[in-house]
Amino acid sequence: MKVTLPEFERAGVMVVGDVMLDRYWYGPTSRISPEAPVPVVKVNTIEERPGGAANVAMNIASLGANARLVGLTGIDDAARALSKSLADVNVKCDFVSVPTHPTITKLRVLSRNQQLIRLDFEEGFEGVDPQPLHERINQALSSIGALVLSDYAKGALASVQQMIQLARKAGVPVLIDPKGTDFERYRGATLLTPNLSEFEAVVGKCKTEEEIVERGMKLIADYELSALLVTRSEQGMSLLQPGKEPLHMPTQAQEVYDVTGAGDTVIGVLAATLAAGNSLEEACFFANAAAGVVVGKLGTSTVSPIELENAVRGRADTGFGVMTEEELKLAVAAARKRGEKVVMTNGVFDILHAGHVSYLANARKLGDRLIVAVNSDASTKRLKGDSRPVNPLEQRMIVLGALEAVDWVVSFEEDTPQRLIAGILPDLLVKGGDYKPEEIAGSKEVWANGGEVLVLNFEDGCSTTNIIKKIQQDKKG
């Protein structure tokens, strides 16, 4: 499956929030201090990186999108270092300088890839006049496709509700990385992106995925949100939207060195993808891939388009087109965005023969993409008897995915794929045999969506049952 990155260069995003400077001191440690039972680090490298809302803007700019950053800083060396670092990566800064406060700075001391201590230099910006921030937002709304509010509870978003209303009035989606348990502050936002700990701090401990969905949907209703994305660490992400099935995406992280700034990467990629004109589901797909990359780096980091493309391609190509239901929905959404016609068929495909191959090739000719939905082993056993399937599901799917005619392969557990088809809603639903169109599972849903249903003939003389009988006869003979 070929995956096309969003057109990030046409995306304009404004980030407003708590800006900070992350400082890193690196060095070896080989002894314990005689003054106290602590390691002595001989510092040999010092780095400075934008953090907080500034890291979100960096992530947006690293994708090639147009990033604008608004926040509160002091008038000091840290503010100047921030401005220079951000200008170097094409982030347009429009800071509000507050003479009475220092720029928020976090110093981390590391040795042997381990963080030993963090020192914070800050005074909250609560009580600072928010009007200059509002003015900057108003000036930018006509030229951006998304507004990110990055909340680290340092005071820049004290008037967050007014900021939400300004953006919603202009029709600009508002994405918020929340802080604390008072989600009333974020009422009316387009999307909240809490991690699981932040989510459970508001709704209570969730023992199952079903509880996450149930309580998340209540949260959406209570605070008039358009959507909620719960990031769940090694369990991936869950996107919840009113009137839609939950979208659960498994994690793509191979190795985890440091989760610092991972939430910034997620919301940055989400915003840039939405501002480029892609759907929220597609935005989550790319954000999930980006998160898998960034947690494999040390410290606050960004993801380049090449890294993102490689991560996405690696996931999309796994198993020769074999996909989860959630991944398939994203792939179909992307295909539709490109104007491609999606064809779908289903079956057991136990022992693949010439009749199957011919049928699938003919089905593929009717559109641009072909989905093959395959009965699980349990489903096959219920339909065909205890002796079937001959080949387990994984092998059947890999063989189907290797066919040139087949783009995507997905499995289903039920006796029929009606639920799956209703979730995918292909442009054309195809079935082989002597069915009448109205007898085909999922036909009513496809027709109701404006799609077509077609019956194709199988090649005469080819059937899995006949092949099995012949094998059994040959063994007896």
Curated annotation (Swiss-Prot):
It comes from Escherichia fergusonii (strain ATCC 35469 / DSM 13698 / CCUG 18766 / IAM 14443 / JCM 21226 / LMG 7866 / NBRC 102419 / NCTC 12128 / CDC 0568-73). Keywords: Acetylation, ATP-binding, Carbohydrate metabolism, Kinase, Multifunctional enzyme, Nucleotide-binding, Nucleotidyltransferase, Transferase. ATP binds at residues 195-198. This is Bifunctional protein HldE. GO terms for biological process: ADP-L-glycero-beta-D-manno-heptose biosynthetic process. In the N-terminal section; belongs to the carbohydrate kinase PfkB family. In the C-terminal section; belongs to the cytidylyltransferase family. Residues 344-477 are annotated as: Cytidylyltransferase. Pfam families: CTP_transf_like (PF01467), PfkB (PF00294). The keyword Transferase applies. Homodimer. It catalyses: D-glycero-beta-D-manno-heptose 7-phosphate + ATP = D-glycero-beta-D-manno-heptose 1,7-bisphosphate + ADP + H(+); D-glycero-beta-D-manno-heptose 1-phosphate + ATP + H(+) = ADP-D-glycero-beta-D-manno-heptose + diphosphate.
